[in-house]
Amino acid sequence: MAAVAAEAAATAASPGEGGAGEAEPEMEPIPGSEAGTDPLPVTATEASVPDGETDGQQSAPQADEPPLPPPPPPPGELARSPEAVGPELEAEEKLSVRVAESAAAAPQGGPELPPSPASPPEQPPAPEEREEPPLPQPVAPALVPPAGGDSTVSQLIPGSEVRVTLDHIIEDALVVSFRFGEKLFSGVLMDLSKRFGPHGIPVTVFPKREYKDKPEAMPLQSNTFQEGTEVKCEANGAVPDDPSPVPHPELSLAESLWTSKPPPLFHEGAPYPPPLFIRDTYNQSIPQPPPRKIKRPKRKMYREEPTSIMNAIKLRPRQVLCDKCKNSVVAEKKEIRKGSSATDSSKYEDKKRRNESVTTVNKKLKTDHKVDGKNQNESQKRNAVVKVSNIAHSRGRVVKVSAQANTSKAQLSTKKVLQSKNMDHAKAREVLKIAKEKAQKKQNETSTSKNAHSKVHFTRRYQNPSSGSLPPRVRLKPQRYRNEENDSSLKTGLEKMRSGKMAPKPQSRCTSTRSAGEAPSENQSPSKGPEEASSEVQDTNEVHVPGDQDEPQTLGKKGSKNNISVYMTLNQKKSDSSSASVCSIDSTDDLKSSNSECSSSESFDFPPGSMHAPSTSSTSSSSKEEKKLSNSLKMKVFSKNVSKCVTPDGRTICVGDIVWAKIYGFPWWPARILTITVSRKDNGLLVRQEARISWFGSPTTSFLALSQLSPFLENFQSRFNKKRKGLYRKAITEAAKAAKQLTPEVRALLTQFET
């Protein structure tokens, strides 16, 4: 032990020769080295290493001391140091001696005490080798097991210096081998001065890390790191006086760097290191912040909607209108363009009437009352449902109901509509004459029109050659609720018109179900008896409508067939009273022989086609009359579903045919005919030919006229649009397959039975 203390003192006495002074250039590229590392524990642990192995490491510092040698090499260069001092004679002699000693010491396994790394040059190596063997003998027997045993490696102590053989020299790396007993170890020593190491081993030299806050972590170390630590200790040359075998805490911290678990790959709050530094340290566990989230723009789904739902919705047009509705819409649009002078007061009044009435109004029917005296140029229009014409003095009104409207469900209230003053018999004759002329014209027009049917709601006014101003337009609407509510709504509407200083207008509510007994008490004033009113009516009928006076039922029958009723008000010269009477005139060819007389004892509000006496006051009887009238009116146009039909242009269309069809806003689209409906009037005149079709590629169906359909295969070249893709092509493909399957035999089977 005295020799060990002497060596330690000598090492401390010469730090400037082979120690710190020579290590200054080497410390610059290794900023992670710790200055002042105590090499004493290394010296204390070297006692258990065999002699031949420790001498190899000891010779390098001694050989480098006499001249001004380069700084001590890194761990890999310790084995190369004998070659570096080859020109020196003393180093060669020592190398040969060590080789011989190592060969003799390997089988013996005798321990020796290696000298200090920074031994003074004055001390010759021969006395050290003679003095060292007896010193560590008390410790060696406990540490050295039999040579070649399984626990041979356990003799090595971390921090001890061993002698390795340099096999290959590669750029920035050394391949070395170490023989210990019967075992041979080989490895590669990497140059850590260039800031990279083997894969998976953290770089501890650069950058410098602070581990002083973790002194408790001290696991075992690897040889490579310890060799580098020994180099640092030699460079520093600082050896404390305390020869205790306890390692220095700073050395223990350095040892814990290698054997402790590597730090996690990401640390919360860790700064991003410079990019170049990361580039030089691939696959190293350098503290990194958590990875950033990569913002990827969401892919917009343009053409990836489900085809079954979206395409079906796209195929539906904005307004699916049949021929009937199209005609009415076109007529309304034309009338709106020309007759745009409807006052706001009339519209407001119309809305109030709708709100007050309990009856549910059909949405397709719109009441549009307009003030008299405006837009006289509208007299050139046709197809009036209800016509109210002014006589020269704007006192009397004539209401004409068209044959195309279901007047069995729409009876005008005469007690409200037909009230004016100072109407003489001559004016009454003029009224009847005008009514007959209009009825004849209307009958001729409707017989020649092809699209005339009972469901069309006409909105254009009829021409009135003798009127000074145009009358308001009246809509007929079906009666669906009780008559008392309708009466109240009519009364309020009339009072509002009177308060607004406007001429009385015909009401748009249906009063066919009113009790017949209400009219006399409301329409006749107490001062005017029924005899006077009846006499006035009789005078009018004698001049213009000759016929019997006792045929109210015959009158009702004729009216039920043709449904033309004329309501006229015959006002007396007295201003304080008025009486109303109703005369029904049919519009058939035998119009001149029709009966229109109304007796004074009868009600003035009976339906024109009533089969019962007008004096009946029960609501049930009037409702029965309405049902009979509606049944008789429905027979005017006969509709039948057929399986085969010939169009006016000579084409034969059958049920199941594949056709091209067109709807406004969409291209020509393939469709299949489901049903064919042919409507004719009672005289055999063709009204319409309509087909219900189903669209290919869509679950929707439509009603279209046969004139708007064209055969699929015959018109394929002219109808097919090559530019369209997607569902259009799919529908075309389905239609083509269906058309190929529709052979003449299949058509014959489909059309052999009439439905």
UniProtKB/Swiss-Prot annotation:
UniProt feature, compositional bias: Polar residues = 403-421, 508-527
Q: What is the effect of changing residue 669 to A?
A: Loss of interaction with H3K36me3
List the top taxonomic levels of the source: Eukaryota, Metazoa, Chordata, Craniata, Vertebrata
Please list the GO terms describing molecular function: chromatin binding; histone binding; histone H3K36me3 reader activity; NuRD complex binding
Instruction: Tell me where the cross-link Glycyl lysine isopeptide (Lys-Gly) (interchain with G-Cter in SUMO2) is found.
Output: 208
User: What spans are recorded as compositionally biased (Basic and acidic residues)?
Assistant: 346-356, 368-381, 422-444
One biological process term in Gene Ontology: positive regulation of transcription elongation by RNA polymerase II
Q: What is the recorded name of this protein? A: PWWP domain-containing protein 2A
Q: PANTHER family in the record, alphabetically?
A: AT HOOK TRANSCRIPTION FACTOR FAMILY-RELATED, LP07818P1
Q: Where is the composition biased (Basic residues)?
A: 292-301
> Could you tell me which residues carry Phosphoserine?
81, 102, 116, 119
This protein's UniProt keywords:
Isopeptide bond, Nucleus, Phosphoprotein, Transcription, Transcription regulation, Ubl conjugation
Name the GO cellular-component terms: nucleus
Gene designation: PWWP2A
Q: CDD domains annotated for this entry?
A: PWWP_PWWP2A
Q: Where is this protein found?
A: Nucleus
Q: What does this protein do?
A: Chromatin-binding protein that acts as an adapter between distinct nucleosome components (H3K36me3 or H2A.Z) and chromatin-modifying complexes, contributing to the regulation of the levels of histone acetylation at actively transcribed genes. Competes with CHD4 and MBD3 for interaction with MTA1 to form a NuRD subcomplex, preventing the formation of full NuRD complex (containing CHD4 and MBD3), leading to recruitment of HDACs to gene promoters resulting in turn in the deacetylation of nearby H3K27 and H2A.Z.
